[in-house]
Swiss-Prot record:
One of its GO terms (biological process) is D-amino acid metabolic process. It is an enzyme of class 1 (oxidoreductase). PANTHER family: D-AMINO ACID OXIDASE, FAD DEPENDENT OXIDOREDUCTASE DOMAIN-CONTAINING PROTEIN. The gene is DAO1. One of its GO terms (molecular function) is glycine oxidase activity. Changing residue 242 to V: Increases activity on D-arginine. FAD binds at residues 12, 15, 35-36, 47-48, 52, 54, 162, 285, 334-335, 337-339. This is D-amino-acid oxidase. It comes from Rhodotorula toruloides (Yeast).
Length: 368
């Protein structure tokens, strides 16, 4: 047990919550510190409530072996959750343009049930595709479920806007940085590779049970993601570097028209007017140039020692006040946060274990 070791998890999105839950189950004392909490389902400064939260890999084994491992682990976890109602099975369909990876590198064909290539009759002219059984979760409710599980284990939550890592380390033995886009501006992280990818979607009421991802027309990608509770996410957009949180009416019409062509069952009568729109959503996917960052780093506090009153004293006095601490990073997952969450959280927990076992003042970095 690690009851005397206090870990602060910075951020309460799906990555932070999943990491916190695994750590709490391992016996760590966990405190979640975040500006937005799981109940903040309408906050646009918080990525997790707006996600489609389905399981659809985009990386090949060559491009992303680490991500594939995370996704396989998450898939298995969600299968376990199906009987509880927190995850649901879907029939998945993906269609690609011929110049995409297409059927190449689909490592998940051995994981997902009923995987098979689509015949040309089920694809747009010149496109290729596959079908398989997949899973989704209800993003806001899933995060709230994780939070309840954490509270059962004694984990605590605090609403707080953190501007510097020094605030997060106050009273903590170790900090997990799951801040998403916050990594760009928090002092001590300052990762300018973190960037938003804007996503606009339409939430509709529908009994649809087929998850469709269509990029056969690269100029107009679309997707349909059913989730538990009879709701469907229709999308979407992929605006790299776009911070605009307003709803674009023209985009709404494009999304609805394209999704209706993909699956008429999203409408009660086969028309756009027959689509029961519940809400228009705009969220910012927390991406990172170079991909997700999951690694442990040793840093020295205070961060700016040149401005510290200690800098006026003798070197030995400064050293006595300075301390070296471990920061475990877990951010930059973009649109794959949910489908990689459990596997990434397992790696985070491993890094935390290693930090407590091996870091004894020596500056070093461990990367998975």
């Amino acid at each position: 047990m690690h009851s005397q070791k206090r870990v602060v998890v910075l951020g309460s999105g799906v990555i932070g919550l999943s990491s916190a839950l695994i750590l709490a189950r391992k016996g760590y004392s966990v405190h979640i510190l975040a500006r937005d909490l799981p109940e903040d389902v309408s906050s646009q400064t918080f990525a997790s409530p707006w996600a489609g939260a389905n399981w659809t890999p985009f990386m090949t084994l060559t491009d992303g072996p680490r991500q594939a491992k995370w996704e396989e682990s998450t898939f298995k976890k969600w299968v376990e959750l199906v009987p509880t109602g927190h995850a649901m099975w879907l029939k998945g369909t993906r269609r690609f343009a011929q110049n995409e990876d297409g059927l190449l590198g689909h490592w998940y064909k051995d994981i997902t049930p009923n995987y098979r290539p689509l015949p040309s009759s089920e694809c747009p002219p010149g496109a290729i595709g596959v079908t398989y059984d997949t899973l989704s979760v209800h993003a806001p409710k899933y995060c709230q479920y994780l939070a309840r599980e954490l509270q059962k284990l004694g984990a605590t939550f605090e609403r707080r806007t953190v501007t510097s890592l020094e605030q997060a380390f106050d009273g903590a033995d170790l900090v997990v940085n799951a801040t998403g886009l916050g990594a760009k501006s928090i002092a001590g992280i300052d990762d300018q590779a973190a960037e938003p990818i804007r996503g606009q979607t339409v939430l509709v009421k529908s009994p649809c049970k087929r998850c469709t991802m269509d990029s056969s027309d690269p100029a107009s990608p679309a997707y349909i993601i059913p989730r538990p509770g009879g709701e469907v996410i229709c999308g979407g957009t992929y605006g790299v570097g776009d911070w605009d949180l307003s709803v674009n009416p023209e985009t709404v019409q494009r999304i609805l028209k394209h999704c209706l062509r993909l699956d008429p069952t999203i409408s009660s009568d086969g028309t756009i007017e027959g689509i029961e729109v519940l809400r228009h959503n705009v969220g910012l996917r927390p991406a990172r140039r170079g991909g997700p960052r999951v690694e442990a780093e040793r840093i020295v506090l205070p961060l700016d020692r040149t401005k510290s009153p200690l800098s006026l004293g003798r070197g030995s006095a400064r050293a006595a006040k300075e301390k070296e601490v471990t920061l475990v990073h877990a951010y930059g997952f973009s649109s794959a946060g949910y489908q990689q969450s459990w596997g990434a959280a397992e790696d985070v927990a491993q890094l935390v274990d290693e930090a407590f076992q091996r870091y004894h003042g020596a500056a070093r970095e461990s990367k998975l």
